[in-house]
């Protein structure tokens, strides 16, 4: 149910903004100008324990102020959605062992907002705990960088290279849960007895018989232990007292002599397997995460859908004649492209030579030198005439 609500909320957002939204937790963290590493581990640990009570929403993040702190869900294989900040350096990541836990840190320095800042002033750090089943949840922290590490901002070489389009719409979906809270199972049910049976002690078994109820199988209650009972009765009581899930497949012999043989197939059905430990909510959550990662890769690709050609089915291999003809056509096409490239390179070299001659005018000190240089330029211009078609093709 939780995964379905998250998917429906994402589909309610316009298509052009689905790759820009963050799955952010609705937790009002106070501003933190500085955040020590132990505090990061403590926040992520508490968030992993309280995950069934934390609601999330799809929303846009744009130019967060220094000290902002967010808990977000994001697949590790996908890049971070845009947040309005551009960086002059690549994001680096490293691991750190803190209190027996592995903390992965992604640090992006030299951040700036291109519409209002001319120097890099911000740092973004993303943290996540590894090996605790919380790998897709990140703590994102924005803070001010060091003044000595500030450099001039240049949007032409920054990452990401494209500016964000403004104004942005107010996108925020209804809150949803990524993991539903565990439901309380009333004591006395078959599932409750199955879970509590391995932890029962012999004292509890003596005071009250609590054998699980199997379908299509009848068992006799175990009477209380009597010190005057026969050896056979005492042996039957010990078998019932020390019964566990591992030896329940053995037939029990009650004291009255009535034997109930439990079939092996019924016992396997009753005990279940590994998949019985997964709730429908956990299965839906896993499917949603898998599909969300796949759809994010599809939406972020630069390949147009109409240009994707399906593979040919049952295509027979080409003959040697067809392969030879195809190879010949490819070679001719490569020759034409090489000739065109050489022609364009000649135009570029001519332009560079002309530019160098014109730059020599700045070093002229006499009229004689000016006349000599002017003569060189006229001779060079007459020797090389650029066709108009080349100019139009390049423009």
Curated annotation (Swiss-Prot):
GO cellular component terms, A-Z: chromatin; cytosol; nucleus; RSC-type complex; SWI/SNF complex
First-listed, main subcellular location of the protein, grouped into a coarse class: cytoplasm
Pfam entry (one): SWI-SNF_Ssr4_C
Transmembrane segments: none
Protein keywords: Chromatin regulator, Cytoplasm, Nucleus, Transcription, Transcription regulation
Compositionally skewed regions (Polar residues) per UniProt: 190-230
Domain of life: Eukaryota
Any one Gene Ontology BP term: chromatin remodeling
Subcellular location: Cytoplasm; Nucleus
Chain segments carrying region Disordered: 182-230
Family note: Belongs to the SSR4 family.
Subunit structure as annotated in this protein's UniProt entry: Component of the RSC complex composed of at least arp9, arp42, rsc1, rsc4, rsc7, rsc9, rsc58, sfh1, snf21, ssr1, ssr2, ssr3 and ssr4. The complex interacts with histone and histone variant components of centromeric chromatin. Component of the SWI/SNF global transcription activator complex composed of at least arp9, arp42, snf5, snf22, snf30, sbf59, sol1, ssr1, ssr2, ssr3, ssr4 and tfg3.
Role of this protein: Component of the chromatin structure remodeling complex (RSC), which is involved in transcription regulation and nucleosome positioning. Controls particularly membrane and organelle development genes. Part of the SWI/SNF complex, an ATP-dependent chromatin remodeling complex, required for the positive and negative regulation of gene expression of a large number of genes. It changes chromatin structure by altering DNA-histone contacts within a nucleosome, leading eventually to a change in nucleosome position, thus facilitating or repressing binding of gene-specific transcription factors.
Name assigned to this protein: SWI/SNF and RSC complexes subunit ssr4
Organism: Schizosaccharomyces pombe (strain 972 / ATCC 24843)
Lineage, broadest ranks: Eukaryota, Fungi, Dikarya, Ascomycota, Taphrinomycotina
Gene: ssr4
